[in-house]
Regions:
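Bacterial N-terminal signal peptides
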Residues: 16-30
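Catalytic-loop region of hydrolases
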Residues: 35-116, 129-132, 280-284, 293-371, ...
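Cap/lid segment of the alpha/beta-hydrolase catalytic domain
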Residues: 114, 123-196, 240-241, 248-251, ...
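Alpha/beta-hydrolase fold nucleophile elbow
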Residues: 197-206
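Glycine-rich nucleophile elbow surrounding the catalytic serine of serine-hydrolase chemistry
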Residues: 206-214
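A catalytic-pocket lid/entrance helix-loop region that shapes and gates access to the active site
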Residues: 213-325, 451, 465-478
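Short beta-strand/loop motif that positions the catalytic acidic residue
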Residues: 412-414
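Conserved alpha/beta-hydrolase "acid-adjacent" motif
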Residues: 420-424
Length: 555
């Protein structure tokens, strides 16, 4: 399960797309023509890999075990391509999680192995193998594993069509609880069979943030270090927040905040709360301090609509900034989005409700493919969802003591400009962990939370994005890469407090660095020193955040 979400027929860029293997361009025959061809080592590697098809792995059937040469291409359904940089032994397998339920996995075993396993996650509802995650991990020398969460799909649902795996309570429970653990157990056995030794350390990284947290909370022995990106740990409430964000435009179309309206609103927010620096940067350093009221943009008589918002649009903006509560119990369903996230609001106004909340709730709670999500009642229906779905799909247990006791380390990253998973939810989770751990320092012995200004969901956005995983870091060092930081923490005891995150020109590493920022582990936050270039991370220092800057204010 799947960090949070983000894909529709009109907006596949919102999630890490499902990567489906479409054939290796060079082909296995090409391996013999590579620079390593013709050597005894080649033949040995090919034989060693192919023997895995006869290996006895518990509850697992190996369907394919072949050497994949460097420069092999794996095509994404949206046309993007992942390319291997070195040969790997590619293992395709099926893991039985129940008599009639199976989990598809792939394990990639680099010939030059670093003695470590990296489990990887996926976005949305899953249903696919994420080859870009596998390629990235194997390139760094990790034995890598990724799974399809137990069904075949493209990461989202379709309005008016039931999700088979969500309509079956046992299959839904497997999807929520057994998407990562069985693939991890199988991967460790496959590693032992191939290399003749077990991994010294095991790590998990993904968006996929809920998958990551399920491992920390329920299967603490699987991984030594976990990188959880933008995790929607209150998953059933996240689905309800999608309905909240889309409800008013569905009932009152003139409330829709268009692309132009969102740009207008965002500029006003940046100007009001950050001035010239924020306008130049494109994001706020400290969104929790911002109190901009969208009513300031409401059209007055004679105003041009191009320069103001209608009354209905102002109402929609206020809804998206505001938390939604259960109308019967008063309990928080989900907090509002931070000021400065406005340019990412297109999907929350329709697509996330139609392609995620509607199919999942129709299948698992209401039992009717035709269920009309616009009739959702945030009292009775919200209570029903909490009763039937929350215990199954949520991964918000703040008791991570078993993981901490065995020396496990968790780094969670969350963008302040995330327009899918409201950013104060991870802060709330951290604070609950701290309550159980005897305070913030108790939590920080095993848990670091990184709140990244200007970053969207799992990267992206106007701010520095490399810590979110949407772009590679400038180097894989502990101060620039979360997995490297986990290795330093787990293996050498060096706890991280300050990172450097990068924004590339045009969001393309090939176009060079646009700017870099310091990112500090909560409750610290980066603050400009008052001198030096704002394009340099060295111009920012880590200081203690006050209550508002910690994200309490917009609750």
């Amino acid at each position: 399960m799947r960090g949070s979400c983000g894909k529709s027929n009109a907006g596949r860029h919102l999630m890490r797309a499902a990567l489906l293997w479409t054939g290796i361009v060079t082909g296995l025959a090409g391996y013999g023509a590579s620079a390593r061809a013709g050597t005894d080592d080649d033949a040995q590697q090919i034989e060693q890999c192919s023997r895995l098809q006869q290996a006895h792995i518990k509850d697992t059937r190996v369907e394919l075990a072949q050497i994949v040469p460097a420069q092999s291409r794996f095509e994404n359904v949206d046309g993007t391509v992942a390319v291997t940089s070195a040969p790997v032994c590619r293992v395709v397998a099926t893991v039985s999680t129940a008599p009639k339920r199976k989990l598809g996995i792939e394990v990639w075993l680099p010939l030059d192995w670093n003695d470590r396993l990296l489990g990887t996650g996926k976005s949305g509802f899953g249903g696919f193998i994420d080859y870009s995650e596998l390629t990235s991990a194997a390139t760094r020398g990790f034995a890598a594993v990724n799974g399809d969460t137990g069904y075949k799909g493209s990461g989202s649902g379709e309005p008016g069509k039931l999700l088979d795996w969500a309509a079956d309570p046992e299959a839904l429970r497997d999807w929520a609880h057994l998407s990562v653990h069985p693939m991890t157990v199988a991967a460790k056995e496959i590693i032992q069979a191939y290399y003749g030794r077990s991994a010294k350390y095991s790590y998990f990284s993904g968006c996929g943030g809920v998958e990551a947290m399920r491992e920390v909370e329920d299967f603490p022995d699987d991984y030594d270090g976990v990188d959880a990106r933008s995790p929607g740990v209150y998953y059933s409430q996240l689905m309800q927040s999608f309905l909240w964000g889309a409800m008013l435009p569905a009932r009152q179309p003139d409330a829709l905040l268009t692309t132009d309206a969102l740009a207008l609103l965002n500029r006003a927010v940046l100007q009001h709360c950050g001035g010239a620096h924020a306008l130049a940067d494109g994001f706020l350093d400290d969104p929790a301090q911002c109190r901009f009221d969208p009513a300031e943009l409401q059209c007055k008589s004679g105003d041009s609509q191009a320069n103001c918002l209608s009354a209905a649009q102002v109402q929609q903006a206020k809804r998206l900034y505001s938390p939604v509560h259960n109308a019967l119990t008063g309990e928080l369903i989900y907090p509002g989005f931070a000021r400065g996230s406005e340019r990412g609001w297109a999907a929350i106004q329709h697509q996330l409700a139609a392609y995620y909340a509607q199919p999942l709730l129709a299948s698992s709670v209401f039992g009717d493919a035709r269920w009309d999500w616009t009739t959702f009642d945030f009292g009775a229906d919200a209570t029903r969802v909490d009763r039937h779905l929350s215990p199954i799909v949520n991964a918000a247990n703040p008791d991570i003591s078993r993981f901490a006791a065995r020396g496990g380390k968790l780094i969670m990253t969350q963008g302040w400009a995330d327009a899918i998973n409201a950013p104060t939810r991870p802060i709330e989770y951290f604070n609950k962990v701290a309550e159980r751990a005897g305070g913030v320092e108790g939590a920080r012995r095993s848990f670091r939370l990184l709140m990244v200004p200007g970053m969207g969901h799992c990267g992206h956005g106007p701010g520095p994005t490399t810590l979110g995983g949407s772009s590679p870091p400038t180097e894989y060092s502990p101060d620039r890469d979360v997995v490297s930081a986990l290795q330093d923490w787990v293996e050498r005891g060096k706890a991280p407090d300050r990172f450097i995150s990068t924004k590339y020109a045009n969001d393309n590493p090939n176009d060079g660095v646009k700017f870099e920022r310091a990112v500090c582990a909560y409750p610290l936050q980066a603050r400009y020193k008052g001198s030096g270039s704002r394009q340099l991370a060295s111009s920012f220092s880590c200081v203690e955040a006050d209550a508002e800057s910690a994200g309490v204010a917009n609750r």
